[in-house]
């Protein structure tokens, strides 16, 4: 039933958002933006930030969503308060929306702002948004609770939601169980569904789409489409709230995505119904896991009356025209959007920019996974050119944050080996090369902007944490242990470490420590690693010294 219902639903233009944005609200947003810009002109970015307290409801307890966010902001003397751990989603359970509501209302009077994941308050977390069986009535009840939040909490609310992802394949417990077997078919089906919605489906593709439908169990495909329809309705309600001023700022993130997919299609629907809304109030962004830190950076900048400027500097080659994996937008479109989301503006030149966002991209514009055979510790001519430019910038005292996005899910080994051996990386504001390009870019912007208010010691700890995680672990230690597990037909352990967790942890710690000892920037660093979700995909890096 839901197969046809979903097709019918998404075929309608989503244009029931209340018409053109109310003039009064739009004027208020533009007036606020003008006031912030004026303040930025009168106040230098380097002013000492005042002590802030921000309530933060994360997507779940993964380090990139929780611990790393808290550590980043507290390094800049900003107090971040999270709900008790037992209320936050983990790899084994959903979060507790009702308990988080109560916690928010109790803590709000003593905070300056709140940054909230609506997925946590509606579905119980990111994985919950992909696997829930919550009724439409209950979802509407939770959205209504959100609607009242503005009057309940006397502070600025920054919120973010997600459009359910459409992965090519997925294993583990982060999707419905059937996705591990029919995921590729669902992805192919969603691509054709997107083309059909745009009126571009050929007769041959229509037959393929029908064949895919026949070869999947109706109950399983129907379950997936039903959940998508429910979540799309929730996002439409949330954008209405943003239009009516219920949030100070609201963003929707497109999780693992492609230029043809259900995620892309639903993003297009929402874009059509919100085209008239100011980007000072609402945005649709690529990527999800970086949004918590990105919105906190926005709250931080606005609270301190600053609107810093960011200049994107690309390595030689495709650069801004690169289309990353897991994204439906080229960097020339997605990077400026994330700069805006952080409460900053894009500079027209590097000369007077408060932050230079250096982006290491593949010369040919083709992004591969960090496990690719060519991700070796040998620098290309393009690498050498970009390292030379970065060295000049750092030696001249410029504020530089590096997004290493030539590969997905880890660092560019050739580029980073040359960089770490050629120049002093201590002055670098931030480094990020984790997960998707959009994740890494968002973190690089946020950490780069916040670094101005950190001590050199605090900044160094965060820098070394990311180098150990994104470079040493993701591109090397994880790759090595994955290859070994596959060789012994134990690929299952990548998604559930089970009884081998201790042995694998010892091996990856030794590998990361060996690499740390090889480079001056990390030599002597004391750190521990752990597997917060009992799988290989992510580690928690804790810097001891």
What does each model-identified segment do?
Residues 45-49:
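Sec/Tat signal peptide C-region and signal peptidase I cleavage site
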Residues 23-34:
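Bacterial N-terminal signal peptides that target proteins for export
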Residues 13, 27-29, 302:
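Generic detector of N-terminal low-structure segments
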Residues 2, 29, 38-39:
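Generic N-terminal initiation segments characterized by hydrophobic and/or small/turn-forming residues
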Residues 34-44:
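Bacterial N-terminal signal peptides
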């Amino acid at each position: 039933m839901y197969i046809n219902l979903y097709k019918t639903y998404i075929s309608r233009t989503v244009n029931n958002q209340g018409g053109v944005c109310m003039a009064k609200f739009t004027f208020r947003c533009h007036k606020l933006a003008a006031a912030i810009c004026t303040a930025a002109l009168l106040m230098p970015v380097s002013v000492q930030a005042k002590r802030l307290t921000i309530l933060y409801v994360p997507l779940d307890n993964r380090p990139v969503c929780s611990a790393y966010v808290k550590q980043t902001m507290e390094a800049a003397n900003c107090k971040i308060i999270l709900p008790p751990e037992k209320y936050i989603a983990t790899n084994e359970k959903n979060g507790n929306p009702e308990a988080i509501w109560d916690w928010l209302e109790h803590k709000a009077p003593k905070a300056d702002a709140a940054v909230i994941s609506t997925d946590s308050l509606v579905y119980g977390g990111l994985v919950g948004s992909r696997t829930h069986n919550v009724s439409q009535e209950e979802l509407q009840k939770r959205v209504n609770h959100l609607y009242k939040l503005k009057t309940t909490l006397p502070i600025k609310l920054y919120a973010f939601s997600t459009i359910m992802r459409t992965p090519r394949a997925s294993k583990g417990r982060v999707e419905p169980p059937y996705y591990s077997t029919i995921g590729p078919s669902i992805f192919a089906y969603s691509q054709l569904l997107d083309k059909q919605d745009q009126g571009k489906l050929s007769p041959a593709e229509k037959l393929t789409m029908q064949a895919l439908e026949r070869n999947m169990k109706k109950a399983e495909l129907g379950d997936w489409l039903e959940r998508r329809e429910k979540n799309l309705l929730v996002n439409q309600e949330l954008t209405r709230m943003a239009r009516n001023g219920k949030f100070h700022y609201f963003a929707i993130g497109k999780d693992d995505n492609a230029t043809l997919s259900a995620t892309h299609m639903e993003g297009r629907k929402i874009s059509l119904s919100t085209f008239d809304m100011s980007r000072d109030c609402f945005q649709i962004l690529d990527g999800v896991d970086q949004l918590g830190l990105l919105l906190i950076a926005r709250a931080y900048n606005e609270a301190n009356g600053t609107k810093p400027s960011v200049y994107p500097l690309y390595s030689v080659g495709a650069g801004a025209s690169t289309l990353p994996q897991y994204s439906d937008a080229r960097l020339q479109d997605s990077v400026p959007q994330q700069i805006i989301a952080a409460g900053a503006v894009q500079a027209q030149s590097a000369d007077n920019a408060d932050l230079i966002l250096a982006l290491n991209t593949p010369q040919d514009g083709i992004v591969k996974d960090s496990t690719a055979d060519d991700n070796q510790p040998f620098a290309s001519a393009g690498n050498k050119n970009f390292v030379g430019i970065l060295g000049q910038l750092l030696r001249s005292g410029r504020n530089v944050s590096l997004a290493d996005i030539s590969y997905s899910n880890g660092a560019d080994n050739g580029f980073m080996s040359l960089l770490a051996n050629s120049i002093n990386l201590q002055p670098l504001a931030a480094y990020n090369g984790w997960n998707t390009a959009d994740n890494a870019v968002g973190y690089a912007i946020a950490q780069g902007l916040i670094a101005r208010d950190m001590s050199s010691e605090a900044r160094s700890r965060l820098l070394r944490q990311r180098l150990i995680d994104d470079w040493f672990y993701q591109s090397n230690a994880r790759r090595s242990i994955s290859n070994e597990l596959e060789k012994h037909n134990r690929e299952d352990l990548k998604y559930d470490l089970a009884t081998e967790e201790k042995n694998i942890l010892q091996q990856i710690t030794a590998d990361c420590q060996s690499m740390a000892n090889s480079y001056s920037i990390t030599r002597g660093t004391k750190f521990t690693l752990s597997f917060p979700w009992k799988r290989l995909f992510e580690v928690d890096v804790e810097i001891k010294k």
